[in-house]
Structures are given as C-alpha cells and as structure tokens.
Amino acid sequence: MTIYEQIKDALKNKINELVSPQEVKKTLQEKYGTNPDSIILSDYCYNRYNKGISFNKHLFEYMNRSSYKYLGENSLYTGLIFRKSKGEDKEVIVGEWVNGVKSLREASVTNNQINDQAEIISKEQLVNLYNEYNQILRYEMNVLNCKPTELRHLIGRIGEFICAIQTNGTLARQTNQHGFDVVSDGRRISVKTTAQSSGFISINKNTFYDFDDFFVVQYVNDDFKVIFFGSKEEVQKISRIYGSQYEVEISLLKKLNKEYQLN
C-alpha cells in the first residue's frame, strides 16, 4: 500500500478536520510501519506545489507547517496553488482550482513576476476570497463581538474585492506601491471602505496623483454598498483641505454618485 493509500485509509473519518504532520506520521508508523521521514504531507496538497512531484494526488489543504485540513480525494476545491522553492522569500502562485478543476501554469514564475501575482488571480478566486472574508467578518462581529469600526483592515480588504469583482479588475499589489488598490482597463482605482454612516473620508494629498478613479464602499446594517465610483477630479471639487489630507463628506459623495447614475 502506497503512502497515499495509507493516508486515505487512516484519515477516512476525518474529512474537513485539521491534522498535524506529527499526528499523521505517528498513525502511519503504528498502523503500517511506515518510516515517518518518508511521509511528506505537502506532497499531497491541493494548494501546495512541490517541485519534482507529479502533482496528481491531492488530499489536503495546506494551512501552515503544523496544520493541514484533510479534504480527501476528488474534492470540489476552489483556491490558489502556491509554490515556495529554496531560495525564494515568499510563496509564488503557480495555478488555481475552481470547483475541483485544476489549472497549472507550467512556466516557472520569475522573481520579476512575483510582485504582479494579483494579476493572475481569476474572478472565481476573488469571489471565493470575498466569501471567505465575509465569513470571518461575521465571526468577528457575531461571536467575538467586535464592532465594524474595529475591523477596518478586514472590511477594507472586502471593499477591494468588491471593486475588483465589479470592475473586472485586478488587485494591485506591487512592492512599494502607493495610492491605488485595483487596476481596471488601465485605470488605477483607489478604494475606500467605511463603516461610518456619516462624517467624512480622508484622502492623502501626497498620493492623490497616483490614482485615476475613486471607489467608495459603505458597510452599514450588515451590507456593503458602493456609494461612489467615479473620477478623482469630481471628488476633489467637493473636498476640503485639512493639513495633508483631502476630506470629503459621505453625504456629498452619495449625492454626487446619484448625479452620475442619472447622467
């Protein structure tokens, strides 16, 4: 019996459970006498590509070095495929799964391409990430009793997903990048997400010329709504200057957005 078959047999009752490499190695050693050093769980992951393997046997979702989620064979998995080779500082996207269908980019990713990885994330992956982040948001708010204003980074990322999905754009994630979050049809979009029902939104004057359009999402009453999407020049007209910031009233953005929709 191969190690792959041993793992399937030993973990057949642990679908969707987290396991550790130590736990699996101990089980296989006790049950089959398998050498623990020959058991490499990352060789059997949906989302982890190890150079030199055939990458056609998938059982786990890699969470971190000490934690794997057992999905079993032929899972309808949706997610990105990562590779981290020796000498690389970070993981590289080399493919994706969409509802159990695998797509690998055979060409090796060069270091110059690593900064632009967001460009190869498909819309299906963005929707999947949007759903996962919303689940985390609900957990933070309903279980841990956090307020939306305490989860600015989380709702900010969800706002970026909404923008990328609605504009058919890509997340902009280049090293030392400033000013914009999404690129769509060559236009750089700055995304702001707020949990405030009123008040103002700040825009850094120093990065104002680094983007083209402004996309504002408001999170109120358990709902994300786009309250403005348009050119930065229109926003600048209704903004006031406070120090190194432009400040624009949320109510004025909503009014301006209605004018855009009527035209």
From Swiss-Prot:
InterPro entries, sorted: DUF6998, DUF7225
Pfam families: DUF6998, DUF7225
Protein name per the record: Uncharacterized protein YnaC
Organism (species): Bacillus subtilis (strain 168)
Phylogenetic lineage: Bacteria, Bacillati, Bacillota, Bacilli, Bacillales
Gene symbol of the encoding locus: ynaC
